[in-house]
Amino acid sequence: MKPIQSPSGVASPMKNRLRKRPDLSLPLPHRDVALAVPLPLPPPSSSSSAPASSSAISTNISAAKSLSELERVNRIGSGAGGTVYKVIHTPTSRPFALKVIYGNHEDTVRRQICREIEILRSVDHPNVVKCHDMFDHNGEIQVLLEFMDQGSLEGAHIWQEQELADLSRQILSGLAYLHRRHIVHRDIKPSNLLINSAKNVKIADFGVSRILAQTMDPCNSSVGTIAYMSPERINTDLNHGRYDGYAGDVWSLGVSILEFYLGRFPFAVSRQGDWASLMCAICMSQPPEAPATASQEFRHFVSCCLQSDPPKRWSAQQLLQHPFILKATGGPNLRQMLPPPRPLPSAS
């Protein structure tokens, strides 16, 4: 920590004070030079008239949008960490979503976000919301995202299995793509699954939101997010302290899909209940199951997602080949791919 210096022209009352013990001095704290890394600056703007308080963090200048060219239309979502606005890029009249993340973040967090944003900009999949750009404006981090005109799937009730299978296929396609790129979402839930008027479903809120969540007090985290966490993520003792983020994403997907089918949170407690009730329900009870009225394929699909033992869960890529998913495309002899039913007890 640097000592506080008096402003120029103002005499310090301590300046001419005589030292009673000149042979004594306070030890200076050790400073690790490896930590003295300056915050990376954005690339210089091609126009000298650009405002200094707003800059785009981007290496692809042709894809960058100036923040001054974005006109806010209305607020489309908000939470503890920030607000999402629908904006229009005035030169092209193209709509985008602008996520404004509040808070003064430490330099280390900003450096990490700068590195992560380049990864997010390279993500290109029809079932993943595209990250176009990022701005640092007056201390606020603002992320320019693809606009999904129908919003999130939170509160959706999708009881028709054909429609639910197609929706699941799209989510799994995006999730398998992220996993192949070694990206773990860590927050799959209905509010992070967006849909547009063309019925395209896309995964949102990964990457930067994950980094920021790591810097926040866990006591300030959303209970709704806890509701979709896997048991071993909440209680690390369940899997000997090992956490597989890919398997955790699959669990969260399974809870979300079952919630769509039932039209309610699938556990015996409220999704917005207290932490203790949620954690007991998730970690100590049996995983929820699809009702007996559902098809055999769907019941098995949910079971493959919601295995208590993480290694027994199917991967996103494997689930894409599950009979419930293939049924949406009309694949033949799908029941032959399911395990045989349990034998009935003998009458003797």
Curated annotation (Swiss-Prot):
Residues where ADP-ribosylarginine is found: 313
Residues that, per the record, bind ATP: 76-84, 99
Result after altering residue 215 to A: Impaired phosphorylation by MAPKKK5
Phenotype upon gene inactivation: RNAi double mutants MKK4 and MKK5 have a strong abscission defect. RNAi mutant MKK5 shows super-sensitivity to high light stress. Insensitivity to abscisic acid (ABA) in terms of root growth inhibition (e.g. root cell division and elongation) and stomatal response leading to increased water loss under dehydrated conditions. Impaired ABA-mediated increased activity of MPK6.
Residue numbers annotated as active site: 187 (proton acceptor)
Enzyme Commission number(s): 2.7.12.2
Catalytic reaction list: L-seryl-[protein] + ATP = O-phospho-L-seryl-[protein] + ADP + H(+); L-threonyl-[protein] + ATP = O-phospho-L-threonyl-[protein] + ADP + H(+); L-tyrosyl-[protein] + ATP = O-phospho-L-tyrosyl-[protein] + ADP + H(+)
PTM sites of type Phosphoserine: 6, 221
GO MF, one annotated term: ATP binding
Known outcome of mutating residue 313 to A/K: Loss of ADP-ribosylation
Keyword annotations from UniProtKB, A to Z: Abscisic acid signaling pathway, ADP-ribosylation, ATP-binding, Hypersensitive response, Kinase, Nucleotide-binding, Phosphoprotein, Plant defense, Serine/threonine-protein kinase, Transferase
GO terms of biological process kind: abscisic acid-activated signaling pathway; cell division; defense response to other organism; floral organ abscission; inflorescence development; plant-type hypersensitive response; positive regulation of ethylene biosynthetic process; regulation of root meristem growth
Result for mutant: residue 99 to M: Loss of kinase activity
Tissue expression pattern: Expressed higher in stems and leaves than in flowers and roots.
Pfam families on file: Pkinase (PF00069)
Modified residues (Phosphothreonine): 215, 225
Protein kinase domain segment(s): 70-325
Protein activity control: Activated through serine and threonine phosphorylation by MEKK1 and MAPKKK20 in response to abscisic acid (ABA). Inhibited through phosphorylation by GSK3/Shaggy-like kinase ASKs. Inhibited through ADP-Ribosylation by P.syringae HopF2. Activated after high light stress.
Location of region: Disordered: 1-26, 35-54
Quaternary data: Interacts with P.syringae type III effector HopF2. Interacts with BZR1. Interacts with MPK6 and MPK3. Interacts with RACK1A, RACK1B and RACK1C. Interacts with MAPKKK5 mainly in the cytosol. Binds to BASL. Interacts with MAPKKK20.
Cited function: Mitogen-activated protein kinase kinase (MAPKK) which regulates abscisic acid (ABA) responses in a MAPKKK20-MKK5-MPK6 cascade involved in root growth (e.g. root cell division and elongation) and stomatal response, probably via MAPK6 activation by protein phosphorylation. Involved in the second phase of hydrogen peroxide generation during hypersensitive response-like cell death. Involved in the innate immune MAP kinase signaling cascade (MEKK1, MKK4/MKK5 and MPK3/MPK6) downstream of bacterial flagellin receptor FLS2. Activates by phosphorylation the downstream MPK3 and MPK6.
Family to which the UniProt record says this protein belongs: Belongs to the protein kinase superfamily. STE Ser/Thr protein kinase family. MAP kinase kinase subfamily.
Name this polypeptide is given: Mitogen-activated protein kinase kinase 5
